[in-house]
């Protein structure tokens, strides 16, 4: 068995008038993330990590923000397509370790549903997805609540 590791990162600006999607879950908040799609930074970071592990470039290459077909698209669809892309090269998801950086909303109570949602989309076990939430102690753009970022590391396997 061959294993490969990938790393992904994404960040989007918080703005009024948008829904806040994280980990495929709609969260109640006064602001949402600005982006061409639903701007789910966690799913985008995971997509980039998976594509990186398979040496298949990045999310912007496969799902460009210049393409109308991806305007306001549900990022769960992008994640499913990404899993299919890496499967075309013989890779499957081993496990995911991700961190979301946000001052608000508090995310602890939402993490189990994010894990369940992502596991269902990818066809993997919930125990193979670790999601953590942290703040930047009020430092930088995240601390000023101007945006939310996410980091993801994945392990992929190929027989």
Predicted regions and their residues:
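C-terminal edge-of-domain segments
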Residues: 142-159
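Short acidic capping loops at alpha-helix termini that bridge into adjacent secondary structure
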Residues: 125-128
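Short, low-complexity, polybasic intrinsically disordered segments
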Residues: 111-115, 144-145
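Pyridoxal 5′-phosphate
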Residues: 131-135
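RNase III-family endoribonuclease catalytic core
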Residues: 2-112, 121-122
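Short active-site-adjacent structural elements
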Residues: 108-109, 138-141
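Glycine-rich, mobile lid/loop segments that gate access to catalytic sites or pores
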Residues: 118
